[in-house]
UniProtKB/Swiss-Prot annotation:
This is Proline-rich nuclear receptor coactivator 1. Keywords: Activator, Nucleus, Transcription, Transcription regulation. Nuclear receptor coactivator. May play a role in signal transduction. The keyword Transcription applies. GO terms for biological process: nuclear-transcribed mRNA catabolic process, nonsense-mediated decay. Residues 141-162 have a biased composition (Low complexity). One of its GO terms (cellular component) is nucleus. The gene is PNRC1. Expressed in liver, lung, fat and NK/T cells. Residues 66-175, 280-300 are annotated as: Disordered. Pfam families: PNRC. It is found in: Nucleus. It comes from Homo sapiens (Human). InterPro entries: PNRC-like_rgn, PNRC1/2.
Length: 327
């Protein structure tokens, strides 16, 4: 009779979660004496990828320890070779990724860039393209192959052309003998099998006139509507232009009035200038004329002796009158 207990220093895996370090299996399961006749368990090999047991101690004690995600460890081995997982189930196998189907629109629109990338991305499985069509043929990653066929149109084309058998995918080193090119023609998709030597761009050059004709047919009502709108716009433009012409005809009268006003202003300015010229006051810019200056007394000028006597008498009279000297 042997009683086995898990050591406390090693974390115990319970229900897919890591048990705290202070946890004991005896307190969780109770004192369960287990009688086994099996040989003692082999010593568990330590996992080199496992983290040290003291790493999560501050985190469990409530401190600010490093909150790292614990890596999955092998569960503790029990004597009866059973896992210590309470209600644990084996991990389910990963589900295979299902390829999303492209919704076919009535107008034959292009799929999203993600689907185009998924379709034309080279896979690692022996050079086989992951985006093989419903017939299993290898699609050409070109501009013409970007259009996804609608299921109804694809079924119709497959039923109409039984000659196009599903081609085997070519080896990675070899080039396929035929390439299937998807073409969209006004919302309808067709598959055309071409030999390897023929270029893909030749189809577009050959089919361009037909597409242009169809576009012109569909664009006829649009051109009519646009022409009617243009006629309306021309009518409004004509009316606006006539209004502008009338305004421009009215403008010359205003121009003549402006010219008259400018002439009047110029004449008033000229009269003011002429009046200033007639003013006899002193002008600091021009030298004074001799007629405006006062005449000096005659005795200052060089004169004869006779005039000098008369001037003396006059000066004596002037001085007496100025000084009020009584004679």
């Amino acid at each position: 009779m042997t009683v086995v207990s898990v050591p406390q220093r090693e974390p115990l895996v319970l229900g897919g979660r890591l048990a705290p370090l202070g946890f004991s299996s005896r307190g969780y399961f109770g004192a369960l004496p287990m009688v086994t006749t099996a040989p003692p368990p082999l010593p568990r090999i330590p996992d080199p990828r496992a983290l040290p047991p003291t790493l999560f101690l501050p985190h469990f004690l409530g401190g600010d320890g490093p909150c790292l995600t614990p890596q999955p460890r092998a569960p503790a081995a029990l004597p009866n070779r059973s896992l210590a997982v309470a209600g644990g189930t084996p991990r389910a196998a990963p589900k295979k990724r299902r390829k999303k189907k492209v919704r076919a629109s009535p107008a034959g629109q292009l799929p999203s860039r993600f689907h185009q990338y998924q379709q034309h991305r080279p896979s690692l499985e022996g050079g086989r393209s992951p985006a093989t069509g419903p017939s299993g043929a290898q699609e050409v990653p070109g501009p013409a192959a970007a259009l996804a066929p609608s299921p109804a149109a694809a079924a119709g084309t497959e039923g109409a052309s039984p000659d196009l058998a599903p081609l085997r995918p070519a080896a990675p080193g070899q080039t396929p003998l035929r390439k299937e090119v998807l073409k969209s023609k006004m919302g309808k998709s067709e598959k055309i099998a071409l030999p390897h030597g023929q270029l893909v761009h030749g189809i577009h050059l050959y089919e361009q006139p037909k597409i242009n004709r169809q576009k012109s047919k569909y664009n006829l009502p649009l051109t009519k509507i646009t022409s009617a709108k243009r006629n309306e716009n021309n009518f409004w433009q004509d009316s606006v232009s006539s209004d502008r012409i009338q305004k421009q005809e009215k403008k010359p009268f205003k121009n003549t009035e402006n010219i008259k006003n400018s002439h009047l202003k110029k004449s008033a300015f000229l009269t003011e200038v002429s009046q200033k010229e007639n003013y006899a006051g002193a002008k600091f810019s021009d030298p004074p004329s001799p007629s405006v200056l006062p005449k000096p007394p005659s005795h200052w000028m060089g004169s004869t002796v006779e005039n000098s006597n008369q001037n003396r008498e006059l000066m004596a009279v002037h001085l007496k009158t100025l000084l009020k000297v009584q004679t």
